[in-house]
Amino acid sequence: MHLSEITHPNQLHGLSIRQLEDIARQIREKHLQTVATSGGHLGPGLGVVELTIALYQTLDLDRDKVIWDVGHQAYPHKMLTGRYNNFNTLRQKNGIAGYLKRCESKFDHFGAGHASTSISAALGMALARDAQGEDYKVAAIIGDGALTGGMALEAINHAGHLPNTNLMVILNDNEMSISPNVGAISRYLNKVRLSEPVQFLSDNLEEQFKHLPFFGDVTPEMDRLKEGMKRLAVPKVGAVIEELGFKYFGPIDGHNLRELINTFKQAHKVHGPVFVHVATVKGKGYELAEQDQVGYHAQSPFNLVTGKPIPSSKPKPPGYSKVFAHTLTKLAENNPKIIGITAAMATGTGLDKLQQKLPKQYIDVGIAEQHAVTLAAGLACEGMRPVVAIYSTFLQRAYDQVIHDVCIQNLPVFFCMDRAGIVGADGPTHQGMYDIAYLRCIPNLVIMAPKDEAELQRMIVTGVNYTDGPIAMRYPRGNGLGVPLMEEGWEALPIGKGEILRNGDDLLLLGYGTMVNTAMQVAEILGEHGIEATVVNARFVKPLDTDLIVPLAKQTGKVVTLEEGCLMGGFGSAVAEALLDHNVLVPVKRFGVPDQLVDHAKPDESFADLGLTSSQIADEVLKSFFKTQEPSVIS
């Protein structure tokens, strides 16, 4: 059977092991071809091919529900649920999402982009099933990286207290999240995987039994026998899980279809919560990805033979994350109090560079954003300079800790929010739209954003040097503007002070962060129409430079704000509030992300869809404030 013929996962029922192995081969081929062409997550999905096939072969997915954690490990799931034939649109505008979306398929039972949510959602569905007197299976598939998240442990704690609620938790244990896992839980799982009795029984039991005359060929009961002997040989296998109220199976070879199918069939018969521990290899089937599991977690388009990224047509400036990591590491070399903290995102944030150079000044807490923030608060209490490098979208997970543990106590923690603004192909779960709004309302917190990578360097110095309380900096995904950078000697910025980049009497353009460059482009377009605009780089949304902005607003009589974030509660709102507070009643036009979700697409496509290109903004300004002028041509 060809994979393109499978439009429903129940078509796996009745297929032989050989046929299922062929399906697995086709999934890996399609997975590799697609990601090599258009980019996406590579290692996670390759590691769960057999797990997915085996589980779906034992379920009725017209009724039963499977909840995937994170979602980027669910590419095989997408191919088996009717999306093979348009899988080449993965992560492209109007194409298949890189994560799970309930609106995309009836088989995507719960949306996922952030880690550690699956067990909670699955338990909720299981309880709803029981409350409504229905009868179907619910399974959650979670990686060992996501299992370091407190939310997953909270859900396990709850589920283990419900002995009459049927729920299957499947641990996809590949010893990795994006980077190698950290912490006691990971260490415990590795002991289980790598214990000598488990390894011997997994590798040699069938071969040994073949030599016994009364056994002959390996019987269908071998997997059950193997499981029982593992328990006798290693009493501690799964002991912690079973003490928490789960029936434990494992560890199971995650690439042995026969063993997986037999184990899942046994587990389905268990009454109450059951935990199936599956040992997999991240990147399975692509040797380069197996050897470099961090580097091949996610890829831009690459050459399948060499594994090397396809070079761009022209050189690109260094990315913001790279500049951040380089600058912070240089500062940390001369300041042993600087401690970089990441929540399992060392590579993404660039803190792996700090780890390599100054390992004693680096902490990876695992997927534990709440802990990361309060840990930083504790470090700050004792005079250290904690720098929490975190994606904007993930800081949302620690909002209470930001308020309660940092800002109320006015502790000097430096939050560096990567991927702020429009992130592109990762879509709504990863867009960094909300940080300006959700942080601006918190007392004691200073918030800033650089206009380019050179100003990023100065803001890093500003944040490290600021000891009067907490401070946050947002910066985007992707490459800088190509401005000259300094290797040292960066000067801190005065807190709460912006700068004038261009003078004009007709209009005030206030840009924040990445939109400062756009504001300059808008001013150029307006200048072609005889309209001269003052352009201000705000630098700080809190405290806002009202000493600069208010007089300029009075002088020009027209104000336009530009930001790469949500309009509600954002930078434009801060400006409008300040003008009202100073009784300056001038028209204000705000440009940013409206009250909507921004789907996956290339960033420039999203900017155009949102009306945030320089030509679109200039046209709108002309129509709103200068109705006699002809609009420019939108490129």
Curated annotation (Swiss-Prot):
Signal sequence annotation: none
UniProt entry keywords in alphabetical sequence: Isoprene biosynthesis, Magnesium, Metal-binding, Thiamine biosynthesis, Thiamine pyrophosphate, Transferase
Metabolic or biological pathway: Metabolic intermediate biosynthesis; 1-deoxy-D-xylulose 5-phosphate biosynthesis; 1-deoxy-D-xylulose 5-phosphate from D-glyceraldehyde 3-phosphate and pyruvate: step 1/1
SMART domains referenced in this protein's UniProt entry, alphabetically: Transket_pyr
SUPFAM superfamilies recorded: Thiamin diphosphate-binding fold (THDP-binding), TK C-terminal domain-like
Domain of life: Bacteria
Protein's name according to its UniProt entry: 1-deoxy-D-xylulose-5-phosphate synthase
